[in-house]
């Protein structure tokens, strides 16, 4: 297992070591010990899974403290463009976004720390996404940023006029008006 740092501090791509042969493959998607050896000490408490059709866009979501979540995101089937936006007001990369292609084929994962908004778009026919969280869902602390905020200039890999977006996500504020407490 190895970690690929991004230009945003604390936001990392995790690449597992895959063992393959004529039968298929095996890999550890998460090991508390190996993560700790890599300097990542997180106690995950909840796993979430979603299934989405091509053109679906989910996000950008976050939870405010004290229920802020770190997420470890991976794709079980299909392909997504996974996006994280830095909401930490004291960070030199505040308001900057990072995106990465996650797929069942490349087996990469994105570790999204507390203080970030997270979302993804589905670019394959369907996608199953699983993510581990270090805090439970708390409706009262949820927040979000509109996916098409022009100041973020995110390339979702699709025509946004055709995107399948929930009503809830369509009415989220731009980053300048979000209720982030980070």
Predicted feature residues:
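Non-catalytic, conserved peripheral segments adjacent to functional cores
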Residues: 1-105, 126, 133, 138-182
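Conserved metal-binding segment of the jelly-roll/cupin
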Residues: 102-125
């Amino acid at each position: 297992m190895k970690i690929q740092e991004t230009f945003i501090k604390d936001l990392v791509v995790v690449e597992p070591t895959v063992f393959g042969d004529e039968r298929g493959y095996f890999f550890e998607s998460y090991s508390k010990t190996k993560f700790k050896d890599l300097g990542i000490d997180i106690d995950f408490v909840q796993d979430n899974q979603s299934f989405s059709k091509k053109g679906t866009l989910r996000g950008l979501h976050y939870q405010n403290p004290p229920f802020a979540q770190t997420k470890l995101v991976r794709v079980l089937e299909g392909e997504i463009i996974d996006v994280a936006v830095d909401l930490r007001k004291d960070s030199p990369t505040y308001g900057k976004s990072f995106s990465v292609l996650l797929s069942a084929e490349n087996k990469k994962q994105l570790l999204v720390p507390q203080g970030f908004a997270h979302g993804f778009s589905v670019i394959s026919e369907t996608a199953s996404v699983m993510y581990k969280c270090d805090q439970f869902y708390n409706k009262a602390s949820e927040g979000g940023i509109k996916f098409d905020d022009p100041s973020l200039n995110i390339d979702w890999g699709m025509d946004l006029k055709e995107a399948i977006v929930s009503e809830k996500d369509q009415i989220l504020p731009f980053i300048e008006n979000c209720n982030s407490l980070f």
